[in-house]
């Protein structure tokens, strides 16, 4: 049986351990990554005890400049802030150009050139496009005749009187189109 002195000693050691663990800063387990900037002297999580800590920032939102937005300077480990943001949560990315009066969400991308204003973000125009009614994302690569549809490729050499369709390849020395001769 355990003596009362041992129980009291065990209780005191347990209390000392609990007090010491509350006094030390909390560390994240091994393998967790911290990226982005964070205040060094901050050990308290945001709204952990039901009140706002003293190190919150008041920053005006770009959407509505009349009401301020409360943000925590210390974000939890692993949260990334990249790009510009207003009231969106951390980790939302804004890339490309965005019309400020348009109500498109963050993360919509505009790349390439866009002609019409009603085309959606994220539609890509690559290569040259001749007629205006061809949809975005159609690619023209290689040389083509005017009656050939977009996206047809001509590679290799083809004579003007050759009846082979586009996309047939001539490589090496040949008798018929597409047959290959290796070596000497």
From Swiss-Prot:
Species classification: Eukaryota, Metazoa, Ecdysozoa, Nematoda, Chromadorea
Record-linked SMART domains: GASTRIN
Listed name of the protein: FMRFamide-like neuropeptides 3
Subcellular location: Secreted
Stored PANTHER family: FMRFAMIDE-LIKE NEUROPEPTIDES 3, FMRFAMIDE-RELATED PEPTIDES
Keyword Ribosomal protein set for record: no
Leader sequence segment: 1-23
InterPro entries reported for this sequence: FMRFamid-related_peptide-like, FMRFamide-related_np
Keyword terms, alphabetized: Amidation, Cleavage on pair of basic residues, Neuropeptide, Secreted, Signal
Residue ranges of the propeptide: 24-25, 39-73, 130-142
Tissues showing expression: Each flp gene is expressed in a distinct set of neurons. Flp-3 is expressed in the IL1 and PQR neurons.
GO cellular component: extracellular region
Role description: FMRFamides and FMRFamide-like peptides are neuropeptides. SAEPFGTMRF-amide inhibits the activity of dissected pharyngeal myogenic muscle system.
GO biological process per UniProt: negative regulation of action potential; neuropeptide signaling pathway; regulation of nematode pharyngeal pumping
Positions where Phenylalanine amide occurs in the chain: 35, 82, 95, 111, 126, 155, 171, 182
Family that this chain belongs to: Belongs to the FARP (FMRFamide related peptide) family.
Record region (Disordered): 90-110, 150-184
Gene name linked to the record: flp-3
């Amino acid at each position: 049986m355990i003596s009362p002195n041992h129980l009291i000693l065990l209780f005191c050691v347990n209390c000392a351990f609990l007090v010491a663990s509350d006094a030390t800063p909390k560390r994240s387990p091994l393998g967790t990554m911290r990226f982005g900037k964070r205040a060094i002297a901050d050990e308290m999580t945001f709204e952990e005890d039901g009140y706002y800590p003293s190190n919150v920032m008041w920053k005006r939102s770009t959407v509505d400049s009349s009401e301020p937005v409360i943000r925590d300077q210390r974000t939890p480990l692993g949260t990334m802030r990249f790009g510009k943001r207003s009231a969106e949560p951390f980790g939302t990315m804004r890339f490309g150009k965005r019309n400020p009066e348009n109500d498109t969400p963050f993360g919509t991308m505009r790349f390439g050139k866009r002609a019409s204003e009603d085309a959606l973000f994220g539609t890509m125009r690559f290569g040259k496009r001749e007629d205006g009614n061809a949809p975005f994302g159609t690619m023209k690569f290689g040389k083509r005749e005017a009656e050939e549809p977009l996206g047809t490729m001509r590679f290799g050499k083809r004579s003007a009187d050759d009846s082979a369709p586009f996309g047939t390849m001539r490589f090496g020395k040949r008798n018929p189109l597409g047959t290959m001769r290796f070596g000497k």
